[in-house]
Regions:
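Hydrophobic face of amphipathic alpha-helices that form TPR/SEL1-like repeat modules
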Residues: 1-35
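Hydrophobic face of alpha-helices
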Residues: 47-50, 69-76, 84, 88, ...
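Glycine-rich loop-to-alpha-helix module at the N-terminal edge of alpha/beta enzyme cores
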Residues: 31-125, 411, 415-423
């Protein structure tokens, strides 16, 4: 696949359309290598895509659920077999994932999303009124939304691109899918797998393009019904505001459903009773898997002074072992960051740290973009708990540690550490506590109940599994609608209660009138 350069078209009006405006996706491990070229949607293309999707909506939503489900179940089978390695390769080359990370994303998680969503939908449709009065039949209909769904997917998970577009479509909606420019190759392959599985071509419109231009046309349309988004907090807040302004103007036929999962400044909180080896190894994995480019990645760790020397030693030793290089070479744990802008942001943070007296570099601190965008895993110890590295999301392989003093009053120190965890960051996505003392676990679980939508005990802050740990957070991290659960599907249906009476009413008066 490294020697092939696919051309990715728009997918509008049952045709693949090539436009005069094009972009390229490069291999982040070798930024001189073009992985894919793609057409960019113009404002008129977006309008055409909306019209095509809405024209396809009546037939698609009227299909029996079993027929819609069959499409996505077949797609899951195609991904599990025929296209597994192609999709993994596109993810490895285009998004910089090693084989393990590509497998658990582009294969396993994507397949799980497609299959579990069918099960969740069946369970949702089965939720019917618990009681019928004599002579009355009550039922609930789960209607697709009136209009279309706008799905904006990120670069870092092929599975998310699939879920953002496929989940609403499964429920009978039509979708305009804007993929990340940095995941075009894998997302285009996935789109074509859905078509091969039997998805009507106009149900999901594949529209790469300038984000602001595409979004402007979509949010201006009166039949915009929902946003399904994963990406940065800043962009989500902007979109939320634009949609709110549209609601205030009376622009939309209904109130759009807004579903978003954004950033995180995820924590590991270590208690003095923790298994030090486990806590250190889990922290390395949580921070540096996929170069820290997961919204759930561990980026801050709080360690008690009583075990800091042992923890630091093991942490640094493990980080030093990590191999950095091309993701298709099996020895490498760390691959490239996704693009030049990310590299610039991360290398800038490393450069700034060199002059920062409140930071001590423990390991790493190097980078190289001569061929690919490589940033070596880096760990700092901060002398102050309010350092900006504890609150600024960098989205890369940089971890910051703070050592809290537990030598005088361990219980009070752990409580204060919980307060730090909760108050330092605006996010609320994921976090972990490491302790063998059950009282400490229980204390942290309660104290940090709003600090993380996914809370882990004695395991890393990453790795939510569909059907096991529904994923999402609140505060600045999103709407917490929980991908990988039945809850997310409720956001893409509109319930209608239907009451039918079998017996005629014969008089106006109440029994009390007699």
């Amino acid at each position: 696949m490294r020697d092939e350069v696919p051309s990715c078209s728009l997918a509008i009006l049952t045709a693949q359309i090539k436009t005069s405006s094009t972009g390229v996706q490069v291999n982040p491990s070798d930024h001189n290598t073009v992985l894919a070229t793609y057409s960019q949607a113009s404002p008129q293309d977006v309008k055409t895509a909306i019209d095509a999707a809405l024209a396809a909506k009546p037939e698609w939503e009227s299909l029996p659920f079993a027929d819609r489900a069959a499409v996505f179940l077949k797609a899951a089978d195609l991904i599990s077999g025929k296209y597994r390695y192609d999709l993994m390769a596109a993810t490895m080359l285009g998004q910089g994932k090693n084989a393990w990370q590509a497998e658990i994303d582009a294969a396993a998680e994507l397949i799980d999303f497609l299959r579990f969503n069918v099960q969740f939908a069946e369970e949702l449709y089965a939720q019917q009124p618990a009681h019928n009065s004599p002579g009355v039949w009550n039922r609930t209909e789960y209607r697709p939304l009136e209009g279309f769904v706008y799905a904006i997917s990120p670069f870092n998970f092929t599975a998310i691109g699939g879920n953002l577009s496929a989940a609403p479509a499964l429920m009978g909606n039509v979708v305009l899918w804007k993929p990340s420019d940095f995941a075009i190759a894998s997302n285009w392959l996935l789109y074509n797998i859905l078509l091969e599985a039997g998805l009507p071509k106009n149900v999901i419109q594949f529209i790469p393009g300038n984000p602001e231009e595409v979004t402007r046309e979509i949010l201006a349309h009166p039949q915009f019904a929902s946003l399904h988004y994963t990406g940065s907090t800043a962009v989500f807040r902007k979109l939320y505001g634009q949609i709110g302004a549209g609601v205030a103007e009376g622009r939309y036929r209904s109130y759009p459903r807004i579903v978003g999962e954004t950033g995180g400044k995820n924590f590991h909180l270590i208690h003095a009773s923790a298994d030090i080896e486990n806590a250190a190894i889990q922290t390395v994995r949580g921070a540096f898997e996929y170069q820290g480019q997961k919204c759930s990645a561990t980026s801050r760790v709080y360690v008690p002074a009583s075990i800091w020397p042992q923890f630091k030693s093991r942490l640094v030793d493990e980080v030093k072992k990590l191999q950095v290089g091309n993701p298709w070479e099996s020895k490498n744990f760390i691959g490239p960051v996704i693009h030049a802008a990310s590299f610039k942001k991360l290398s800038g943070a490393i450069d700034a740290a060199k002059e920062d007296k409140d930071l001590e570099l423990l390991v790493g601190g190097t980078y190289d973009d001569s061929k690919g965008y490589f940033v070596h895993p880096t760990v700092y110890e901060a002398k102050t708990p309010d350092h900006k590295l504890f609150s600024t999301e960098l989205f890369g392989p940089i971890l910051t540690a703070y050592v809290y003093d537990d030598t005088k009053d361990p219980v009070a120190a752990f409580s204060s550490a919980c307060d730090l965890v909760d108050s330092t960051s605006e996010y609320g996505l994921t976090g972990s506590v490491f302790a063998s003392d059950r009282a400490a676990v229980r204390f942290a679980e309660e104290k940090l109940r709003n600090s993380a939508g996914n809370f882990y005990i004695n395991c890393k802050s990453t790795g939510a599994v569909v059907g096991q740990q529904p994923f999402g957070g609140s505060r600045a991290s999103g709407t917490n609608d929980k991908a990988g659960s039945i809850n997310i599907l409720t956001r893409f249906v509109s319930m209608r209660s239907i009451k039918e009476e079998f017996n005629a009413t014969t008089k106006v008066e109440y029994p009390s009138n007699e």
